[in-house]
């Protein structure tokens, strides 16, 4: 009898142990599944698309799990709960259209990050009309100089940085040695420094002929002062390319300068003259010296080029003109970005909902809606705002400022909307 009970207990314990192991395995699988599901939900649409396309069968333990993961990734990418069928079809057509393009054309089009198949078509047709056909790099006029130079914000998928051989600061210094002006003054006597030869048969010197690029890893190695120095160097190169293009053709990429440049106005020095100036400029950055002062408002600057740009605010000078709509801009970067709106190109994209935006600053502001970030704070009461303009308007409740005046009865208002409502009474 006792032996029988012992055998029954052993059998029961064996079954209970097996059930315990099975239950623990199920819980672990469920926990892993929930963890993976949470990670999937956090992916941006662009990341989800890349995960969906790069998913491999061996990443799953069984066929059913592979199907489930593909369904989750595809759902996260296409978002059928918020996108219409027409929009989803457009996304699929655009993606496949980009994959069947020739490699060089594909890279060039993807750098503009089109959101619609029609936009991609316009880009391809535009590229085909240009001399030389397929390009491997995008010029500053096409992406905007900030997109080409820095892109410390979002880099569109497909964007590839040029390979680098030298250390970051060495390459900044090397590319200051760009142009050397010979004793003769004829156009064909302009010469490029070593590694940047300008063929005499070339009809237009472009920004790409002189630009220097960093990889994302190299950019992270630079300090704030070195990044500022790089911006100054690239701005000078950019304006030099524009001035040379103006002398030769009068137009660069459909953009016309409102004022002409001459060789006397844009003197190009030799590397021996330029390098000491560069090192002196770099040294001023460490000391915090700002020797250039605006006579109108007293603001000081580290480099003279920044002072010249700043003074346009006081003079209301707008040198850069759009040929298509005659709108003028103070800065070349503003014209470059504006030019993209005529082409239907919005290079910046919200990673949350895929919304296309033409300016990187607008993208940063838009994303605060998703992140909840409110960087602007009222020092009087501590209230915070997403937009600086809203803070300025709100601060008038503390200061009592009323900048808007009715031209009829001379009554003052703190908000423009209040003035417009009041004027309806007249």
Curated annotation (Swiss-Prot):
GO terms for biological process: regulation of transcription by RNA polymerase II. A zinc finger (C2H2-type) spans 292-314, 320-342, 348-370, 376-398, 404-426. SMART domains: KRAB (SM00349), SCAN (SM00431), ZnF_C2H2 (SM00355). Residues 49-131 form the SCAN box domain. Keywords: DNA-binding, Metal-binding, Nucleus, Repeat, Transcription, Transcription regulation, Zinc, Zinc-finger. Residues 205-289 form the KRAB domain. Gene3D superfamilies: 6.10.140.140, Classic Zinc Finger, DNA breaking-rejoining enzymes. Transmembrane segments: none annotated. SUPFAM superfamilies: beta-beta-alpha zinc fingers, KRAB domain (Kruppel-associated box), Retrovirus capsid dimerization domain-like. It is found in: Nucleus. The keyword Transcription applies. GO terms for cellular component: nucleus. One of its GO terms (molecular function) is zinc ion binding. InterPro entries: KRAB (IPR001909), KRAB_dom_sf (IPR036051), SCAN_dom (IPR003309), SCAN_sf (IPR038269), Znf_C2H2_sf (IPR036236), Znf_C2H2_type (IPR013087). Belongs to the krueppel C2H2-type zinc-finger protein family. May be involved in transcriptional regulation. This is Putative zinc finger protein 75C. It comes from Homo sapiens.
């Amino acid at each position: 009898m006792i032996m029988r009970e012992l055998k029954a207990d052993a059998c029961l314990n064996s079954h209970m142990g097996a059930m315990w192991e099975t239950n623990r395995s199920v819980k672990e699988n469920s926990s892993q599944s929930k963890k993976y599901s949470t990670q999937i939900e956090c992916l941006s649409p662009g990341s989800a698309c890349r995960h969906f396309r790069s998913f491999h069968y061996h990443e799953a333990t069984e066929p059913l799990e592979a199907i489930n993961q593909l369904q989750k990734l595809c759902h996260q990418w296409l978002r059928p709960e918020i996108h219409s069928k027409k929009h989803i079809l457009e996304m699929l057509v655009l993606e496949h259209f980009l994959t069947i393009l020739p490699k060089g054309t594909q890279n060039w089009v993807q750098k503009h990050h089109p959101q619609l198949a029609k936009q991609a078509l316009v880009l391809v047709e535009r590229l085909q009309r240009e001399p030389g056909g397929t390009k491997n790099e995008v010029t500053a006029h096409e992406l905007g100089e900030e997109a080409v130079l820095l892109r410390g914000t979002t880099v569109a998928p497909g964007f590839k940085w040029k390979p680098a051989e030298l250390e970051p600061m060495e390459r900044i210094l090397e590319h200051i040695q760009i142009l050397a002006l010979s004793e003769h003054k004829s156009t064909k006597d302009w010469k490029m420094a070593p590694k940047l030869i300008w063929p005499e048969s070339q009809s237009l010197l472009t920004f790409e002929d002189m630009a220097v690029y960093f990889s994302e890893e190299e950019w992270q190695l630079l300090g704030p002062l070195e990044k500022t120095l790089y911006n100054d160097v690239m701005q000078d190169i950019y304006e030099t390319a524009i001035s040379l293009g103006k002398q030769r053709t009068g137009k660069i990429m459909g953009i016309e300068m409102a004022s002409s440049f001459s060789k006397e106005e844009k003197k190009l020095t030799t590397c021996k003259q330029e390098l000491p100036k560069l090192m002196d400029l770099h040294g001023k950055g460490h000391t915090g010296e700002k020797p250039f002062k605006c006579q109108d408002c007293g603001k000081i600057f580290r480099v003279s080029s920044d002072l010249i740009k700043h003074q346009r605010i006081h003079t209301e000078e707008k040198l850069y003109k759009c040929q298509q709509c005659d709108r003028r801009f103070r800065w070349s970067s503003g014209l470059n970005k504006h030019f993209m709106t005529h082409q239907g190109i919005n290079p910046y994209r919200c990673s949350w909902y895929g919304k296309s935006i033409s300016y990187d600053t607008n993208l940063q502001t838009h994303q605060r809606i998703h992140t909840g970030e409110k960087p602007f704070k009222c020092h009087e009461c501590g209230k915070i705002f997403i937009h600086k303009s809203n803070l300025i308007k709100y601060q008038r409740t503390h200061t009592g400022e009323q900048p808007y005046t009715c031209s009829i009865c001379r009554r003052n208002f703190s908000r423009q909307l209040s003035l417009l409502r009041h004027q309806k009474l007249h």
